[in-house]
């Protein structure tokens, strides 16, 4: 199995290599933790929405006017905040559960045994600290051969060391070697760090959309990005 050249940051060395079955537990941990980190930021984003402010102000105020009880209003605010927290949590939990029940069940089968696909890990100190995957786009635009980047995640203790950029470069090099014309991916307006990384590496924004009514209600859209190779 090929290994890629070791990379060094100013703090600790790491190297990028293809996934092995023995990595599975740690890969799942990195993926799950990375995805669920967006639950608090989604909740904070929801709290900043004007419609949320109106909800948290209007409903308790209506209760005070009807019942005359400020205690009831405070209890109402508490339960509204709890409900909003659960709503912010649900889509990320569903996303993780869906991935763990499909592509992530057997990573070798889903990626390494698929022509034109791959899954890599970043390893530091004998431990997997970052992951990224890529699969061919099933129905690319006419005349294009596209690879989609998925699952990019780096453990919180190893961020700021260039690992995410190195993993992305690994995907780009793989795509170039496999004669793909483009690398495409999706991220969200909530993931500003990822957006900054991709745009800084030459990806271009090609579109945006809301994945579901929930994302529309909370005003979080998904951004489509494309990296086209000059020779394509």
From Swiss-Prot:
The keyword Acyltransferase applies. It comes from the Eukaryota. The chain crosses the membrane at residues 63-83. It is a single-pass type II membrane protein. It catalyses: L-lysyl-[protein] + acetyl-CoA = N(6)-acetyl-L-lysyl-[protein] + CoA + H(+). Its main location: endoplasmic reticulum. Residues 84-232 are lumenal. Residues 79-224 form the N-acetyltransferase domain. Pfam families: Acetyltransf_1 (PF00583). Its EC number is 2.3.1.-. One of its GO terms (biological process) is positive regulation of gene expression. Acetylation on Lys-109 modulates enzymatic activity. Keywords: Acetylation, Acyltransferase, Endoplasmic reticulum, Membrane, Signal-anchor, Transferase, Transmembrane, Transmembrane helix. Belongs to the NAT8 family. Endoplasmic reticulum (ER)-membrane-bound lysine N-acetyltransferase catalyzing the N6-acetylation of lysine residues in the lumen of the ER in various proteins, including PROM1 and BACE1, using acetyl-CoA as acetyl donor. Thereby, may regulate apoptosis through the acetylation and the regulation of the expression of PROM1. Acetylates and stabilizes BACE1 immature protein, leading to increased steady-state levels in neurons. By acting on BACE1 expression, may regulate amyloid beta-peptide formation. N(6)-lysine acetylation in ER maintains protein homeostasis and regulates reticulophagy. This is N-acetyltransferase 8B. It comes from Mus musculus.
């Amino acid at each position: 199995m090929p290994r890629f050249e070791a990379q060094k940051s100013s703090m600790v060395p790491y190297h990028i290599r293809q996934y092995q079955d023995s990595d599975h537990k740690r890969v799942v941990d990195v993926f799950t933790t990375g995805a669920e980190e967006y639950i608090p930021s989604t909740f904070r984003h929801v709290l900043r929405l004007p419609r949320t402010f109106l909800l948290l102000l209007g409903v308790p105020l209506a209760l005070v006017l009807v019942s005359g009880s400020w205690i009831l209003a405070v209890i109402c605010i508490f339960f509204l905040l709890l409900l909003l927290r659960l709503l912010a949590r649900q889509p990320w939990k569903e996303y993780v559960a869906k991935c763990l029940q499909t592509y992530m069940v057997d990573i070798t089968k889903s990626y390494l045994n698929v022509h034109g696909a791959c899954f890599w890990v970043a390893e530091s100190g004998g431990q997997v600290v970052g992951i990224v995957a890529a699969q061919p786009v099933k129905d690319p635009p006419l005349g294009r051969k596209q690879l989609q980047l998925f699952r990019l995640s780096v453990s919180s203790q190893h961020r700021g060391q260039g690992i995410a950029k190195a993993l992305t470069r690994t995907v780009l090099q793989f795509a170039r070697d496999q004669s793909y014309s483009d690398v495409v991916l999706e991220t969200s307006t909530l993931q500003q760090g990822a957006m900054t990384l991709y745009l800084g590496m030459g990806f271009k924004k090609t579109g945006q959309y809301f994945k579901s009514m929930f994302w529309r209600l909370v005003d979080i859209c998904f951004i489509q990005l494309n990296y086209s190779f000059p020779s394509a």
